């Protein structure tokens, strides 16, 4: 009983030390605060948005900021603030969907393959190499040309080419864990393979996977906005940041604020996720 209590205390101390290490940097705290603000804006967009983001009223197009329209209106008379708030919902939900698919596909496969080794591991690695060699633009173009451009198809494109990166990292970490002394002790103690993989190996590699995922969200947001900007992703009139940039590119000289608002939000959220990811990675490296 005393031994278990001591182990729990030691585990709690290690976890507390880890989180202190993660949030030691002011940049990490700032990144987390910004991410929380954007997440809340996305969740409560229907409540916070002063107008319908799809409502067109050309009689008030390109209106300057006012009490009714805090950031003004776009070229079709739509409320810019409302579209930005709803845009955060689309950008974050699409990004987290891609992330969830890639992690759930990439990590479990190589956990088993890396632990078992042999031919299975070799085959999985060759498959990973093939997917790592796929350029995301060509895949997105092929899918858009075959079944049409949409948000769902963009998620599919990004997931197809992104899962291999997580799989490769998870495999390398699994091989490291596999060769550690505690693995021999677990096997000698009669611990089953499934328990070793999911209770011990997965738990130990998870912080590094989370760190990569946090930093990759920024890249995914940029990809979604970029592909939507060139017409291979989310389609108009959806209030997505890349679409807003695309719609306003003709007004860059006369009404630069139309491009400034979505552009600055993309920059801020990408930096926030990068800062947060760096903090998690630093905590993982020093754990």
Give short role names for the model-derived ranges:
Residues 1-36, 275-287:
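Transmembrane alpha-helical segments of polytopic membrane transport and secretion proteins
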Residues 33, 41-76, 230-238:
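Hydrophobic alpha-helical transmembrane segments of membrane transport/permease proteins
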Residues 70, 74, 105, 114-177, ...:
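Generic hydrophobic transmembrane alpha-helix motif, especially the helices
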Residues 78-93, 117-125, 179, 184-211:
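Amphipathic cytosolic juxtamembrane alpha-helices at the membrane-cytosol interface
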Residues 80-115, 269:
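Transmembrane alpha-helix signature in integral membrane proteins
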Residues 89-105, 140, 194-226, 273:
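Transmembrane alpha-helices
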Residues 144-146, 158, 173-174, 222-265:
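Glycine-rich helix-loop "coupling/hinge" segments at transmembrane-helix boundaries
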Residues 161, 207-217, 256-287:
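C-terminal transmembrane helix and the adjacent membrane-cytosol boundary/short C-terminal tail
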């Amino acid at each position: 009983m005393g031994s278990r209590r001591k182990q729990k205390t030691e585990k709690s101390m290690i976890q507390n030390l880890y989180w202190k290490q993660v949030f030691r940097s002011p940049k990490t705290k700032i990144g987390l605060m910004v991410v929380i603000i954007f997440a809340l804006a996305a969740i409560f967009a229907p409540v916070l948005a002063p107008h319908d983001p799809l409502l067109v009223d050309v009689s008030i197009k390109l209106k300057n900021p006012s009490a009714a329209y805090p950031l003004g209106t776009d070229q079709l008379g739509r409320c810019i603030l409302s579209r930005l708030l709803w845009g955060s919902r689309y950008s974050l939900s699409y990004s987290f969907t891609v992330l969830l698919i890639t992690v759930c596909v990439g990590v479990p496969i190589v956990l088993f393959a890396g632990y078992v080794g042999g031919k299975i591991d070799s085959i999985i690695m060759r498959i990973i190499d093939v997917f790592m060699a796929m350029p995301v633009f060509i895949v997105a173009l092929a899918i858009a040309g075959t079944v049409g451009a949409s948000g769902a198809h963009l998620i599919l494109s990004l997931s197809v080419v992104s899962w291999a990166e997580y799989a490769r990292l998870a495999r390398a970490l699994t091989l490291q864990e596999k060769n550690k002394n505690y693995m021999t002790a677990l096997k000698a103690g009669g611990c089953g393979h499934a328990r070793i993989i999911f209770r011990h190996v997965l738990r130990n590699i998870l912080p590094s996977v989370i760190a990569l995922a946090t930093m990759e969200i920024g890249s995914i947001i940029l990809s979604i906005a970029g592909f939507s900007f060139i017409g291979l992703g989310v389609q108009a009139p959806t209030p997505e940041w890349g679409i807003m940039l695309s719609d306003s590119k003709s007004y860059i000289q006369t009404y630069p604020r139309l491009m400034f608002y979505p552009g600055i939000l993309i920059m801020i959220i990408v930096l926030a996720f990068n800062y947060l990811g760096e903090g998690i990675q630093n905590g993982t490296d020093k754990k």
